Amino acid sequence: MKVAASVRKICEKCRLIRRRGRLLVICSNPKHKQRQG
């Protein structure tokens, strides 16, 4: 899980979702997981 100031989609399978007021990127590729910190 990468913690980044600005999260963005890396590939077309990446999905931006909002969970508990945080912006997350979930993807089939585990390397693409990101959270806004």
From Swiss-Prot:
Keyword field: Chloroplast, Plastid, Ribonucleoprotein, Ribosomal protein
PROSITE patterns named among the record's database cross-references: RIBOSOMAL_L36
Keyword Plastid: yes
Gene Ontology terms, MF aspect: structural constituent of ribosome
Domain of life: Eukaryota
Pfam families per record: Ribosomal_L36
InterPro entries in alphabetical order: Ribosomal_bL36, Ribosomal_bL36_sp
GO cellular component, one term: ribonucleoprotein complex
Gene Ontology BP terms: translation
Cellular localization per UniProt: Plastid, Chloroplast
Keyword Chloroplast among record annotations: yes
Family designation: Belongs to the bacterial ribosomal protein bL36 family.
Protein name: Large ribosomal subunit protein bL36c
Source organism of the structure: Pisum sativum
